[in-house]
Amino acid sequence: MPKNSKVVKRDLDDDVIESVKDLLSNEDSVEEVSKKSELIVDVQEEKDTDAEDGSEADDERPAWNSKLQYILAQVGFSVGLGNVWRFPYLCQKNGGGAYLLPYLILLLVIGIPLFFLELSVGQRIRRGSIGVWNYISPKLGGIGFASCVVCYFVALYYNVIIGWTLFYFSQSFQQPLPWDQCPLVKNASHTYVEPECEQSSATTYYWYREALDITSSISDSGGLNWKMTVCLLVAWVMVCLAMIKGIQSSGKIMYFSSLFPYVVLICFLIRSLLLNGSIDGIRHMFTPKLEMMLEPKVWREAATQVFFALGLGFGGVIAFSSYNKRDNNCHFDAVLVSFINFFTSVLATLVVFAVLGFKANIVNEKCISQNSEMILKLLKMGNISWDVIPHHINLSAVTVEDYRLVYDIIQKVKEEEFAVLHLNACQIEDELNKAVQGTGLAFIAFTEAMTHFPASPFWSVMFFLMLINLGLGSMFGTIEGIITPIVDTFKVRKEILTVICCLLAFCIGLIFVQRSGNYFVTMFDDYSATLPLLIVVILENIAVSFVYGIDKFIEDLTDMLGFAPSKYYYYMWKYISPLMLLTLLIASIVNMGLSPPGYNAWIKEKASEEFLSYPMWGMVVCFSLMVLAILPVPVVFIIRRCNLIDDSSGNLASVTYKRGRVLKEPVNLEGDDASLIHGKIPSEMSSPNFGKNIYRKQSGSPTLDTAPNGRYGIGYLMADMPDMPESDL
């Protein structure tokens, strides 16, 4: 038997027995053969794979310095601005405390299983989103490219929001705050309050006129807003510097950027609970309206929020988990991060409505004061008799309860004439029912509430610093979802790619810092991510469950984790989650079709918002954003299907595991005794596709066989050979 024959499984070819006997008879001890088998995997003794920490031989891929850094990175990515200004709005809009039940159910059915799936494939294959789905099936490689495109679209406008926050942060070091009062306009004859501000409010005026200097329509660009252009540049420089340093540096940044928001939220909660009206806000928030649970819209919006809250489909989850050790318990990570995300949303909701309750109380007191003055005027004019007013009530210093009593009495006495009196009920619930989300919550409602805080500049600095940290944490994950797949696939230098990516994003982002830029932010937010990400995650679920095979994936997880995942995930991934995602996709398409595409424009003359439809070119841009985001999926599929490029994925299929251990194809084995096992002698050229050409059929046959587990490489098969002395790997 020649020593350069290639080894196959014992039950596939009798040559294996002879080869092993030949090796053992060559004056080698069992220990020496064991060492040689170790060389198959590790190439060099000093690069041996550690079975305990799961590090990979010959793989210079960076790794997290600690498990805590990784968890904080995932938390920082998933917990973002949406937890602060989107979840409270949805909770208030969809039944208060009753909304939490649909959200929790959908978190268990869609959120955690799909989050676990993305963590698993990233850790399993140790590649970014492009490499992961190319590994599953080259025809599905477009899923990874689509994730990158969506990430880039989102990063373009998300960093603009961070730029806005930087502007407000820089303006917070003033006493009083610049949005505390309306500005005065002076001319030669007299001084008067700015009309646009007087008709709206000081914080609304500051946002639309001082910060954005907004135009009245998307068609009127108005030129660049230089203040926001500088802030956008600073935001991209911060992101670029953090990403150039790599995950070790960004991981250290995460200690601050991920933990600081919780410190601020807790401080805000404690401070706001000491203010009048805060309990009214929290009570209003969590008073359940159970009848709303029967509305399909509530479940659709809860599912959408779960979907985006965890960052599914962006590629950031996969990218971060690809730097993990092989035997990391990603199931624990999925559950932990998901519930941290949920409880963060609840904490933010408590803070938001405690603060809004305080604001509503102030507005309500002003309302009562103004209406009490109107009642006094009506009494003096004789429109209302003094006899109907209880004697113990002093309208000059009336309480909420007394005003309510007087209002009810007047309403009964003047039932027919009541409408013309123009009196307001002044109920705090009416103010709390004015649902506010997004920039309206952060830059208008919340800033107005903070002007009434003692030491308001301090709280303003803390609030906007918290938003900056939340935004940067999400941006790191979003950019990682772009950089990691491209670096893994095309082997470009990360530093150069990061600089190019950020510089290009800043240039494109100038669209968003025009005076009409806020309308483009709305456009990108509505159309660049929602449907494309849903399609991406549906395809991810299908790729793992049906293309790769759910049974095979469960086996991989068992090897990787050291225990078999619950059957619950089997049924979720194979049946329930795909069905729920398809339902959500259809519901989103229907909702988008029923809702006319448009935006809320700020009309200066009216000092109020007005809904406007997009012009025809705007419609084209909206449609193009959705098409461009998902276009890589069919393009790559067609290219692979028609064999327009090489369909080989051997370079992606060369890594596998056994009981959480890394097994990798050998390289550069000239002069190594272990090359005998591979049939490699110094005079032979190495196979260009090593992972696919190592399985020879019957002796003498030139035909090559990829074997049932050919994807895994020779290390996986050899580890299971009963007569081969198993190494410590």
Swiss-Prot record:
GO terms for cellular component: membrane; plasma membrane. GO terms for molecular function: branched-chain amino acid:sodium symporter activity; neutral L-amino acid:sodium symporter activity; proline:sodium symporter activity. Residues 42-61 are annotated as: Disordered. It is found in: Membrane. The keyword Phosphoprotein applies. Disulfide bonds: none annotated. Significant expressed in brain, lung and kidney. In brain, mainly expressed int the cortex, the cerebellum and the brain stem. Optimum pH is 7.5-8.5. This is Sodium-dependent neutral amino acid transporter B(0)AT2. It comes from Mus musculus. The gene is Slc6a15.
